[in-house]
Every structure is written in C-alpha cells, then in structure tokens.
Amino acid sequence: MSGVAQGSYLVAGPAVGVVMSTHDQTQLMASQTATLFTDTTAGTNNIVVDEGQVYQTIEGFGAAFTDSAAYLLEQVEPSASQAGTLNDLFTRTGNGIGLSFMRVPIGATDIARSLYSFDDNSGQADPTLTNFSITHDQGYILPLILQAKALNPQMKLLASPWSPPAWMKSTASMNSGTLLSSDYTQFANYLVKYLQAYKAAGVTYDYLTIQNEPLNQTTAYPSMYMDAPTELAVTRDYVLPALTTANLTTKLFVYDHNWDTPAYPTTVLTDPTIMASPLIAGTAWHGYAGPVGSQQTVQNAFPTMGAWETEHSGGTWQTDQFTTDFLEITQVMRNAAKSFVKWSLALDQTLGPNLTELNNGLGGCATCTPIVTVNSATGIVTKDVEYYTLGHYSKYVMPGATRIYSSNTSAVVSVAFKNPDGSKALVAFNNSSASQTLQVQWGTQLFSYSLPSLAAATFTWTGTQMGTPTVSATWQIQGSSYSSESGLEMETTGDSTGGYDLGYVNPGAYAVYKNVNFGNGVSGVSVRTASGGQGGSLEFHLDSISGPLVSTATLPITGGWQTWTTVTASATGASGVHDLYIVFRGTTAGISNVNWFQFN
C-alpha cells in the first residue's frame, strides 16, 4: 500500500496536483505526476467546475472519540509511537489527513469497555446531581481530545449522549426506555454540567445533540427513545433555558438520526421558538437508512439552518467499503452537509472493545470498522481503508472551505471546494468498470486526466477562475449535475453507467442547470428514465420554471425504479446560453427517476 501524498500538494499557477487511490488498494492517496490546465477545446466527458456557484461552508471530516478508541490510542499504543499516530490523524503535515470534526459520546455507547454515565449513583436518584463527575473521561478520553485539539486548533467538537443516567429513565436502565418527564430539568442540568466540566478541563464544545438516534431503542446497549414532540419540548423548554442560564454558547443540532425520517427534524424546526434561538444550528443526520437527499429537502425548507452528517460507520457488512465511501461522502457533500463523520476513530483487531465482548447480555456493533486499528497485544497501529477514503477529503478541504459547483459525467461523480486561501480541491470517483479519460473545465481552462476503473483522485490547484463555464446541451447532462432543485432527491443509481440519478420525484418538482449552451439550436432530446410508479412527463423550460417551453418528454412506466429505458422527444425554440429548468409533471408522488438527458 502506498502512503499518503506529502503536504497539500498545491502548485502555483495552472499546475494541478493529483493524489489517487485505486480500488485494489495498491495505491492509497499516492502522489501522481502533476498535470496542467490548457485552453484546448472541450470534449464530451467533462466535469465542469464553477466557483461562481457557491453552496455550504464546510466545517470538517472526522470520526468519534469513543471510549474504546481513546483507550486504545492512549493506553494500548506505545507512548513512543503515539505522537506519530496523532499527527497522521489530526494534522496535514506528512501523511496527516487533518481530521477536524470529531464527535464525543456523553457516557457509554456500544463501543465502550463498560456501561457508565457521569452520575450513576448506584442507580439511585440524584436530582441535584451532587455526585456528577467526569472522572471516567479524565483517564484517557480527555487527554486524547486535548492532544488532538492542540494539533488541530480548528477542530470542531460535538457531544452526544446515548443515554442519561438510568435513574432518569422509565426502564431504570441505560438501555432502552424513555426519559421520565419528572426528570426533564435534571436531564438539561446533566448536559450543562457535562459541558461545564469539560470546559473547566480545557475543552469547549461547539455543538451538542440531546439524544443519539432518538428513534432507536434497544435492550442491548445504551439508548433512549425520544419522539419529535418530546425532543421539541425538552429542547425548547429545558435545555435551551439551561444553556442560556449557564452562559454557554454551545449550539444544538436537532434529531441526530437517519435520513429516512425527515419529518422528525421538520417537526422540531417548525417551532417558532426553536427557529428564533441563536443556539439552534440545524440538523444532525446519520446514514444507515433512507435517501441522503433528505438533507437537502430539510435544508430547502429551513434555509437558515445547517446540515451535518454526524455518523455513518463502515462495517464488515459492506462488500466494498472503498466504493461505498466515495459514492456516499461525495453525495453527502452535494446535499448540503457541512461535515462527514465516521463512527469509532479506532478499534482493535477483533473490532472491539465493545459491549458484546462483556458476555453479560449486552450487545451492539461488533462488526463496525474504524479509521485505524490498534492491535491489543502489540499496540501497533494500522491505517484502515477508511483512513484513506476519508483522507481524500479531509486533507485537502480546509475548515471554512465552501462547496462550489461541479458536474458529474456518466461514469464519474465529483464534488468541488474552494478553500479559505482560494485554492481549489476536486474529488472525483470513477464508478465504472472501465478507465475514464475525463476533462475538468474550470472557467475557460481545462485539463485532461485518465482515471482507472473504480479509482478516486483529489485534484488541487490555485489561481483565479477566468470566465464562466458553459455546458453544451448536446453533452449527456447528468440529472445529478443540477445547480439547485426542489421536490426531488439524488440517489445512487442502478443504471449500467453507475453514478447518481434523480428520484423521489413529486409533481411540480424541478431541477436547474445553469449556463447551458444550445448553440444555433436543437431539434430533439433523449431522456434516460425509470419508473415503478405512475409515470408522467418532463418539461424543459428556459430561464425559469414557467419560461419558454423547449420540449416535453413522456416518462413511461418501466416496471421498476431501476428498470431503465431511453425516450426521445422533439425540441424547438432554444439557442444560445440559458439556465435550463426541467419540470416533472404527473398526478401522484413518485413520477419517475431520471439519470440523464441529452439534446441533439
């Protein structure tokens, strides 16, 4: 396996730095020969980058300081090698990948060496929290966080409880159950005391969620059910006032669970007190169920709120973690996320320690995979594939970067960023079985690069964009290459070319493609579509949702949402450069999926 490319590999002028990882893992974040921007004529397999189209600000990429991860890195790895490991994880020097958004559990999770909270009190109620103590964390969790923050001062920290103390719950257990209404005040004070104790120890939290995965309750490990109305009430009436009284500036994310239930954060954020609070930052999302497009849907509904992806573990259940990561992280970033956070930062060679290993009826994830593995016998640290997949983003996308527009091709998906210093980073993944020679068009400049099958590359460069790029209407324009959308969601496609398609389409949904060049005119359009629903039609309008109608294509029922066919329609009245609006028409939700369209 190759090592990470040294430094950030940014070269002044038109030179483009390249680091690449291959699917067979013979190269992992390995430096390639730099390429150059030229002024040659654009081809048809283009990724268009336009820093004039700006999206969300990025805060970072990371994982979780679980109890097990901290124990392994602080207590098991030999002290002589710890500095090197932490440099690799938290700085961008040498092989470092610069993790800059880290999550910290408040108490035990399933990835822990024991069950604990910070006021267990032998199971007896302690309403004044007299026995509250973070002594457990002072052994190895706090020291690790302090070292990481010293190495990366820009690091953002998020705190999340899996369960409050058992005496606050209906089950009198840290596993399963609900929060007793009589202990709402005590719960809010518990969270405040945790934040205060950490602050006194030198760690200030940027963000807090009040419950990890509130719709998941299990008897196997710490968890607690909290429906949306309860989270709203606890947040609005107890936690926010407690934070204000304590003069804490830590901001709250709502929800902290999967993409499959966007109604949950919608319920919480609809409340006017929540929306007006300066301490509410937005929504935390997990990636274990549902379409990632839920992030963008909620973002569109609450544009002043942010979106953060705060957990999605790799695991032995994944048959191809390499491909899964590049498709997902790219898609998450293209759907408004300010962060992408894996699960446990470190585990041992048996994917522990975890509660399952205690053999006392507890369970949890014994198949989750880490960023690095620490051998429990030797202390030797090994970088896992997720170190490199995450590193393709975290090393080159700085905190404070903004996502900028980039398009996808039929086989290559991408996401682009502009760093605070003006440098650019483009991550591209070839999701096909063949090598792809692609052209990256930045303004009026281009470079070409051959990307092997199922390989990923991060391209970095500096300079000022010259001109505004246009997209030829006669190229195959991917549905997922929209500049903005309403009423639909991006998803991984099952079509033969790979990549993403547009799905979950409601009547009246639309997507916008800026700066489409129709040249001297077009006469027809082809649309790649699949429908397991009612079908409908797709209208092509110029410059607005109700602008001049260029074409209407029928979207037939194909027998399945991933059963693809290509339909054609005539087109007229379009020439020159326009913003193109595609508008879905139908009678019911679930009209049709669209992979691409192409004018002729």
Question: What residue ranges belong to the model's regions?
Answer:
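Conserved, mostly hydrophobic/aromatic
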Residues: 63, 98, 157, 208, ...
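Extracytoplasmic
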Residues: 3, 465-600
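Catalytic cores of secreted or luminal carbohydrate-active enzymes
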Residues: 344, 373, 377-402, 462-496
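N-terminal catalytic cores of secreted or lumenal carbohydrate-active enzymes
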Residues: 25-205, 237
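Carbohydrate-binding surface patches
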Residues: 395, 406-443, 454
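Aromatic/acidic polysaccharide-binding cleft in carbohydrate-active enzymes
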Residues: 306-389, 405-408
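Active-site neighborhood of glycoside hydrolase catalytic domains
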Residues: 186-207, 214-315
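Beta-strand-rich binding/interaction modules
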Residues: 433-461, 536-542
